[in-house]
A protein has these predicted regions:
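Intrinsically disordered, low-complexity regulatory regions with latent secondary structure
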Residues: 175-221
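Cytosolic regulatory protein-protein interaction regions
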Residues: 5-150, 155-174, 178
Length: 221
C-alpha cells in the first residue's frame, strides 16, 4: 500500500483557488464541486486500507467522521451549484451529475468496506447505484458530455457482474466519439477485473488490485 501512495496536493481537494479565471468550470463541465469530492473519498479509502493493514477491522472514528462529512457534502449538492455557461444543456448536466453522484456513493461504500469481501447486502447497495449510473450514461450516448463519464463508468463497471452489461460498457469505451487511448486502456483494465475469479476482484478495491497485479499505470477523473 505504501508503495502506491503518493503525497497529497491539497489543491485537488478544493478547486476554489481557480475560481477567478474566466475558464473556471470548463474542465469539469461546471461540476467541480462533485469532482473535488473524488480525491477526498480516495483519502478515506486509503485510511481504511491502512487501518486494516494494522489489524483494525472496524472503521475508526476518524474514518467515520470523514465519510459522513463527504457524504453530507455529496447529498447537499444540487445541479444549481454547477458553474454553467449558456451553451450547457441543463438536462444533460442533470444526467451527468447524477452519474457522478451515484458513482461517488459506490466509492464511499467501498471505502468503508476497505479490503473486505462485500456481503450480499453491500453488493445490492452497489447495484442500485450502478443501475442509475448506466441509466444516466445511456441518455448521453455519443454526446460531448461522455468526456466527463470516464470515472463514473470505471467505478460502476467494477461492480458490474452481468455479462451483457460488461460487453456494452466495453464497447462504449472502445467506440468513444473521442477515440482516446485511455478509453481503450480503461476497457482493458475492466476486462482484467471481470475475468479474474478472485472474489476480491470486485468494485473499486478490485480495480486497485487489478492495477497492482498487472502493474498498470492508470489514473483518471
Amino acid at each position: 500500500l505504501t508503495e502506491r501512495t503518493f503525497p497529497l496536493d491539497h489543491f485537488i481537494t478544493s478547486l476554489d483557488s481557480l475560481s477567478h479565471y474566466q475558464t473556471f468550470g470548463i474542465m469539469f463541465a461546471g461540476l467541480h464541486g462533485l469532482f473535488e469530492l473524488i480525491p477526498q473519498a480516495s483519502l478515506l479509502f486509503g485510511q481504511r486500507l491502512t487501518e486494516q493493514e494494522a489489524g483494525v477491522d472496524d472503521p475508526s472514528s476518524g474514518c467515520i467522521e470523514l465519510h459522513d462529512t463527504i457524504q453530507s457534502r455529496l447529498r447537499d449538492w444540487n445541479v444549481s451549484q454547477a458553474t454553467t455557461d449558456s451553451f450547457h444543456d441543463k438536462d444533460s448536466m442533470t444526467h451527468v451529475s447524477k452519474a457522478i453522484r451515484h458513482s461517488l456513493e459506490i466509492y464511499l461504500l467501498a471505502a468503508m468496506q476497505g479490503s473486505s469481501i462485500p456481503n450480499a447486502e453491500t453488493v445490492a447497495q452497489f447495484q442500485s447505484h450502478v443501475d442509475i449510473v448506466f441509466g444516466s450514461g445511456q441518455k448521453l450516448h455519443q454526446s460531448q458530455w461522455t468526456a466527463t463519464l470516464m470515472w463514473p463508468f470505471l467505478i460502476a463497471g467494477s461492480c458490474t457482474t452481468q455479462q451483457d452489461r460488461q460487453q456494452s460498457l466495453s464497447q462504449t469505451l472502445r467506440n468513444s466519439r473521442y477515440r482516446m487511448k485511455h478509453s481503450i486502456r480503461a476497457s482493458n483494465l475492466l476486462q482484467r477485473l471481470w475475468d479474474d475469479p478472485d472474489p476480491l476482484m470486485y468494485g473499486p478495491y478490485g480495480l486497485y488490485l487489478a492495477i497492482s497485479k498487472h502493474d498498470i499505470t492508470f489514473g483518471t477523473l
